[in-house]
Amino acid sequence: MKFSEQWLRGWVSPQVSRDELVARLSMAGLEVDSVTLAAGIFTGVVVGEVLSTEQHPDADKLRVCQVSNGRETFQVVCGAPNVRPGLKIPFAMIGSELPGDFKIKKAKLRGVESNGMLCSAAELQAGEGNDGLMELAADAPVGQDIRVYLGLDDASIEVDLTPNRGDCLSVAGLAREVGALYAADVTRPQIAAVSAVHDEVRPVEVLAPAACPRYLGRVIRNVDLSRPTPLWMVERLRRSDVRSIDAAVDITNYVMLELGQPLHAFDLAEINGGIRVRMAEEGEKLVLLDGQEVSLRADTLVIADHQRALAIAGVMGGEHSGVTAGTRDIFLESAFFDTISVAGKARSYGLHTDASHRYERGVDWQLAREAMERATGLLLDITGGEAGPVIEVVSEQHLPSIAPVTLRASRVEQMLGLVIENAEIERLLTGLGLTVSAEADGQWRVDVPSHRFDISLEVDLIEELARLYGYNRLPVRYPQARLAPQANAEAKGDLPELRRLLVARGYQEAITYSFIDPKWFELFSPGVKPLLLANPISNDMAAMRASLWPGLVKALQHNLNRQQDRVRMFESGLRFVGQLDGLKQEPMLAGVVCGSRLPEGWAQGRDAVDFFDVKADVEAVLGFAGALGEFTFTPGQHPALHPGQTARILRDGREVGFLGAIHPELSKNLGLDRPVFVFELVLAEVATGRLPKFHELSRFPEVRRDLALLADRDVSASAVLDVIRENAGEWLTDLRLFDVYQGKGIDPHRKSLAVGLTWQHPSRTLNDDEVNATTLAILTSLEERLNATLRK
């Protein structure tokens, strides 16, 4: 909203400077974006009158003018096409200084002396008109300083309003705010009802009362739109960033800026029959005032006559029914359109107008009659004419209703952190036009006026009090609460610690979208029905993820495309399994790895990361809560993973995750030219462990046996280790696989596994007979169950 400071001060004028006013508005939530001077800096320019003109003897386009400043007559040479006797214009006399440090001196133009300069609006930086002189009103006082006459010691102030403050999209609304801020009186213009001098009306039918609960119309005959808009109105419009068009349009724009009620004037001769406010017919055509033809949709409210649509309600009028210089009779419209019926319609047709901007944010539903009378009075004063009666159609049941709000002083103190006196609370709210009635000590009933459709709750009133009292006056008080530290279960690992663990192992945390491309969903979860969004951001973000891998792999692609060859990322987040009925949202921890095992350095090679490197990272995560022994890795199958490099992770028989290399076909489809490894774990299982139990350290020596075993190639090392554990007895303290060999000297269908076993008794020394007997039992069981034998 852009407005003239002088216009505002005509309504309410607190005794403060412009800078202070601007700062106070911003602190009250009406953020000032810019302050622009109404004209450039100049001096010595007065209202002049052209007494006579003669053709320049040596220049076809120049005229020699005699110009009066009210006391003397001066000869001035001028080339403006609109210079003529009797014209009153800005006259820069000798010694004047115009914007840009341009000083007026006596000069000769083509041999003829010129004593001054006749000015255009552009030369004074008081408008854009540079195609001729700035024409002043016929009654302009000759000799008066032009800055005083036009009120150019003014500024245009632009405020950036939040969408809920549609009530401030007018000088009246801003004046109400300023009056409340400074406890200053607001002087509204006296708007009298205009008496009808003829009885012509056009019938009005509102066929969509929910969208248009109130519609007013009036016929005004015999207007003369050739009459110019008064300069004072043109200037107020200009300083509000509105271009002057003709008297009828200027007046409707002026009233909209002044009161906040959009209006529209139709050429009465172009209305067939009466007015119908209805929904458009699908595909109905309308050529708008800007010349654009639109194909209307059935959800668009239109103003129509008995044959065709005339305007998009609350947005823009039609070209064929618009007023022109030849219009003699007009039909003036003032209506209240429901916010929902207008919201988004302008944008859907590629439009944005001052009217739609206001209707989308809400217009005072009681304002239509006052705006109608104001516009009628201005039209009759400026263009002449004869007003008819106002026809009004109202659907009371569809008009907004605002319930009273209860305000408690205790709640004000609680939310703002200070005590505001009861009288001050009443004064501040009353200044905004609210009706405040005391119900009890420290409690009020507040009736909200029709222009404040954003107030419906007690907190809304408290916000208004904070704005008016001054945010900068509110005390700084930190929240006070009794915070008792929660006891964390020792057997529970928390996510921040898991994050730190992975970061310590060289990973970086990634955060990706929960919604992914349905095509990627199919690649990683083939055969699974995705949960699709009803209104996605874009087509490639239309499915909720069933795994964290798609987002991580996409982030991996992004890094690889930017020459980042070593990538190690992890993410924690939800996966979404199933449809809305029975949807399961499960916290997961996932990672993606590719590139070298270690960062590049002189002391370490560039060996590529492999399955077992990533498995070690996963084991570190699984062991974080102290329950690594409860997890097992078994060969598994996953449609997104390499069939020979996939591990299924189990805990007590429950599947809790997967680890493996991306399937070669999937890698090819995704353009990945190197091995990529991923893992994904159910976070709840990872974070749940067991408390460690202390066992007294044995003082007796350990006994170690190393066994080289031959097993079939398809026998997993974990199966061998499980059999060993089952038969090694209770004193086994350590078991590890330290070598795997396949090749020369070994049956091509077999492999060699070297394991180390360590026993230690807590209270005595173990002898060789005991260890040998246990070793024999292990070998016997391995041969019987896995066909694994001792290598000789």
UniProtKB/Swiss-Prot annotation:
Which reaction(s) does its UniProt entry say it catalyses? tRNA(Phe) + L-phenylalanine + ATP = L-phenylalanyl-tRNA(Phe) + AMP + diphosphate + H(+)
Instruction: Report the residue ranges that make up the FDX-ACB domain in this protein.
Output: 698-791
**Which keywords belong to this entry?**
Aminoacyl-tRNA synthetase, ATP-binding, Cytoplasm, Ligase, Magnesium, Metal-binding, Nucleotide-binding, Protein biosynthesis, RNA-binding, tRNA-binding
Write down the Pfam families for this protein, in alphabetical order: B3_4, B5, FDX-ACB, tRNA_bind, tRNA_synthFbeta
Query: Which superkingdom does the taxonomy of this entry point to?
Result: Bacteria
Q: Which cysteines are joined by disulfide bonds?
A: none
The answer to whether UniProt assigns keyword RNA-binding to this entry is: yes
Q: What cofactors does this protein use?
A: Mg(2+)
Which named protein is this? Phenylalanine--tRNA ligase beta subunit
Species the sequence originates in: Pseudomonas syringae pv. tomato (strain ATCC BAA-871 / DC3000)
Q: What is the lineage of its organism?
A: Bacteria, Pseudomonadati, Pseudomonadota, Gammaproteobacteria, Pseudomonadales
